A protein has these predicted regions:
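Exported/periplasmic ABC-transporter solute-binding proteins
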Residues: 2-149
Length: 149
C-alpha cells in the first residue's frame, strides 16, 4: 500500500540543516547537542544500524511512548529521527527531510482481505481505491510514499 521512511526534525525556528548526503547527515548528528529517536522499529534501526552505516558512534536517546517530534518541539532535544508520517503532524517542529536513501530503513505497509471477511467485495474496493492514482496525493500528504504496482 505504501512505504514509510525515516526523517529528521528540528525545533521550529532553528536553522534547517541539509541532510541530502551521508556526510551531511553525519555532520548534523555529530554536531547536535542532543538526538532523539523513537522506541519503534525505526528507532531500533537508528540505534543499531544508522550510526554504524555513517561510521560514527551511537548517539542519542530512545524516546518511549511519546512522539519524538513533541520532545524536539519542547526543546528537550535538538534533532529528532522517526518515521516521516509520525513527524509531520507535530506542531512546533520543522521537517528537515528524509534521511539519504542509502542509509534509509523503509517500512512497507501492505493490506489483504481475510478469507472469512464479512464484506470482501467492499474491502477489495477500498484497497483498490487506496492503491489508485487518485488516492496517492492524500497518501503522500501524510508522509508515506506510494508503492509502484
Amino acid at each position: 500500500m505504501a512505504d514509510s521512511r525515516i526523517g529528521l526534525v528540528v525545533k521550529e525556528g532553528a536553522a534547517k540543516p541539509s541532510i541530502n548526503t551521508d556526510a551531511e547527515l553525519k555532520a548534523v548528528l555529530s554536531q547536535a547537542k542532543s538526538v532523539a529517536y523513537s522506541d519503534s522499529a525505526s528507532g531500533v534501526y537508528v540505534e543499531k544500524e544508522l550510526f554504524k552505516k555513517l561510521g560514527m558512534p551511537a548517539k542519542g536517546t530512545m524516546i518511549e511512548r511519546v512522539p519524538v517530534g513533541e520532545q524536539v518541539a519542547k526543546g528537550d532535544y535538538e534533532v529528532g529521527l522517526q518515521q516521516v508520517a509520525e513527524l509531520l503532524p507535530v506542531k512546533g517542529v520543522t521537517f528537515v527531510g528524509k534521511i539519504p536513501e542509502d542509509v534509509q530503513s523503509v517500512t512497507r505497509f501492505a493490506a489483504g482481505i481475510p478469507v472469512n471477511a464479512k464484506h470482501p467485495e467492499q474491502a477489495k474496493a477500498l484497497l483498490q481505491f487506496m492503491a489508485s492514482p487518485e488516492a496517492q496525493p492524500e497518501v503522500q500528504s501524510t508522509g508515506l510514499d506510494s508503492v509502484s504496482r
